[in-house]
Each structure stands twice: as C-alpha cells, then as structure tokens.
Amino acid sequence: MKICSLLPSATEIVCSLGLEDQLVGISHVCDYPESVLKSDAVIITRRSSDLSGLSSQKIDEIIKFNREQKIATQIVDGDLLKKISPDVILTQELCYVCAVEYGAVCEITLDILDYQPKIVSLKPAGIQDILNNILLIADACDVIDEGNRVVDSIQTRIDFISNTLAQSNYKKGPKTFCIDWLNPLRNTGQWIPELIELAGGNEGLAEKNGKSREVSWSEVVDYDPDFIFSMPCAFPMYEVDSASRLAFSEVEQFNEINAVKKGQVYLFDGQVPSRHGPRFIDVLENFAAIMYPDLFNGLFNTGMYTKYSL
C-alpha cells in the first residue's frame, strides 16, 4: 500500500502503526520521527509564502492577508502527486494554516489523478478524537489490530495519571495559561485544555475542545495563573525562546503574575503540543510532572520543554 501524508500528525500516526516504509509522500513539515526525512518518501507540499525567521506578528499578518485574498497557505505539487500515485491520502480539516485543506486535496486529486484514492481527513477537537483518528488511519491502511495496540498503550498511560491524581486526593488544581500564539496573544484550544485538566490543572481562560481565541495580557494578569506554558504553534524550541522573551518583555505587569513570581513559566517545543498524533501523551505526562513533581517523579522531560528564566 502506498500512503501519502499531508500533515505531520498523520505521518506520526502512520509511523506509530509500523507503516513508515509504506509512506511514498509527505509534507514539507513532516519531521518526526527523524527517519522520515531520510526515507524514500517524496516531499510534495510547500508554503505559498516564506515564513522562516519572521516574527509572530509578521506571520500573522501574512496568513491573514493570504486568507483574505483566498491564497492557499500550503500547496500540493500535482506532478509529484501523480508520480507517486498513492492508494491512501491523509489530510485534514482542522487548520488552513498548518496543512493542506481537505477541499484542496479533493480538487487536485480529481484534476490530476485518473483514479480515486482513499482520502482520509482528520478534524480532531479532543483526545478521544485523536484516538479515533489513529484507529481510522489504521483501518484505512488495513492494520486495525496495530491501531488498537497503539490506542491501548496510550490509554494505559492516560489512566495512570488519572488514577494517581485520584488516589492522591488532590483538590482544585493550579490555574494554567497555555499560549498558542504570542502576537497577537492567543490561548490554546482543542485538546490542550483537556490535557491540562487530565494533568490536574485548570485552563480557566480556554474552552475544552473549543477553538483558540485572542486574549489580552490584561486578562491574563487578572486571571493570575500559577503556571504559564508558552507553546506557539509550530515554533521550534529556539524560536519559542526568542519569541517568548520578546513578548514577555513588552508586558508591563508580567513580573506581577503569580507564575512568574514563583518561577513557574515553561517554554514548550511548539512543534509537539500542536500536533494531534500519538505524542500528545508525552505532552500530558510533562504537564503532570511539572504541576505535580512529587506524584510524577518518574515522568521525565523528553526534551520537550525548558524552564523560562529572566
């Protein structure tokens, strides 16, 4: 079977199912596991605008302009798609910024291919949706038993955290503020507030399984979170650090926030929490280990985050 994955989350799911050798096409942002970059899979997408090295504000301006002008943020190379002729194409309907949209994929397959591949589109809002998507891809690729194994393994790790917290008789968890974008400031949505809740926290400014929204720093100051997790979408760690420092330096009352006073501001690799693949469980475990180190001493930092220092 020949599989083409047009988003990193789906690529990670495919590899977790043991199907990496069946990937014939990937997107330009598929980078995990690192072995996919050395595989025979062809990169068949590109950005319509070069966003490398730009500030959060500039990226936001370009994305909004492209949207207004109906310019696709991600583009599929039709010639390459025809060349690899996949049996299964994995796409998404969640975010027009992060990957090629489902509608565009359907359109190009009709125009370019002389057959109809199986198109699987993902649109998760919560954790159960992510688990269901693992099974959906497993079923489409005829490895449903392996899909069940992956889901069961993840569920076991979720249950460990839930049961440990329940047995500890912890009360109302700490207030958290998770940052999805720095300028304009946006909180997180979809599965992140749910992960915080499962880890024993309270993402009070966000809606579980809802959409990210713009917030003001005055809202954050009034909310006064106990923890701040900066994880701007798709930013690698070095960009998270520089962008967060710049944004924080411009907030007059930043040092008055409880999380800052207690040294409980953390910078996350933005390429991991934003993905709806199997590694969401690593994000959950890291949230739990940060907020409850005495309970989850065995859960360690996998290089996903670092503590922010002034």
Model-derived features: positions:
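N-terminal ligand-binding lobe of clamshell/alpha-beta domains
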Residues: 1-310
